[in-house]
């Protein structure tokens, strides 16, 4: 029982918390620092901002902050190459040659042909 408690204590002491963020490739991501005096561990440059926030360019990358209390916050950014459909404005294109238009045009043409033929007779 003491061994299990000891292993649980070691596990809690070396705790890692994972944070996942999805973003559009090349945009700037605004994240909150987990602790004010943490140590940054990563190869992507980040820009510290006010209120314990930082900005990072979105690429598929992983970095971490090691807090003084021993907790390590691991961030995983997953970059998408296309923007979400929410921001894409799609306009409906009305084609001139839709089936309904062709049917109506054919009926009008046939009617005109018969009426002009009767007037000439």
From Swiss-Prot:
Modifications the protein undergoes after translation, according to the UniProt entry: Poly-ubiquitinated by host with K63-linked polyubiquitin chains.
X4e domain location: 16-81
GO terms (BP aspect): symbiont-mediated perturbation of host cell cycle G0/G1 transition checkpoint; symbiont-mediated perturbation of host cell cycle progression; symbiont-mediated suppression of host antigen processing and presentation of peptide antigen via MHC class I; symbiont-mediated suppression of host innate immune response; symbiont-mediated-mediated suppression of host tetherin activity
Stated consequence of mutating residue 2 to A: No effect on ubiquitination
Phenotype upon changing residue 85 to A: No effect on ubiquitination
Keywords: Disulfide bond, G0/G1 host cell cycle checkpoint dysregulation by virus, Host cytoplasm, Host endoplasmic reticulum, Host Golgi apparatus, Host membrane, Host-virus interaction, Inhibition of host adaptive immune response by virus, Inhibition of host innate immune response by virus, Inhibition of host MHC class I molecule presentation by virus, Inhibition of host tetherin by virus, Isopeptide bond, Membrane, Modulation of host cell cycle by virus, Signal, Transmembrane, Transmembrane helix, Ubl conjugation, Viral immunoevasion, Virion
Keyword match Chloroplast: no
Tagged with keyword Disulfide bond: yes
Annotated spans, Disordered: 83-95
Principal subcellular localization: host cell
TM regions (residue ranges): 96-116
Further remark: Variant B.1.1.7 is also called Variant Of Concern (VOC) 202012/01, Variant Under Investigation (VUI) 202012/01, or 20B/501Y.V1.
Its job: Plays a role as antagonist of host tetherin (BST2), disrupting its antiviral effect. Acts by binding to BST2 and sequestering it to perinuclear region, thereby preventing its antiviral function at cell membrane. May specifically downregulate MHC-I allele HLA-A*02:01 (HLA-A2).
Record comment regarding domains: The di-lysine motif confers endoplasmic reticulum localization for type I membrane proteins.
Identification of the protein by name: ORF7a protein
């Amino acid at each position: 029982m003491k061994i299990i408690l000891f292993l649980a204590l070691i596990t809690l002491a070396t705790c890692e918390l994972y944070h996942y963020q999805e973003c559009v490739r090349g945009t700037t991501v605004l994240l909150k620092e987990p602790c004010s005096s943490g140590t940054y561990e990563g190869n992507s440059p980040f820009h510290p901002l006010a209120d314990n926030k930082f900005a990072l360019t979105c690429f598929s990358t992983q970095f971490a902050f090691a807090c003084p209390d021993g907790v390590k916050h691991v961030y995983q950014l997953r970059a998408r190459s296309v923007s979400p459909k929410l921001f894409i404005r799609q306009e409906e294109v009305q084609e001139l040659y839709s089936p309904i238009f062709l049917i109506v045009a054919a009926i009008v043409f046939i009617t005109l042909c018969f009426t002009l033929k009767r007037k000439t007779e």
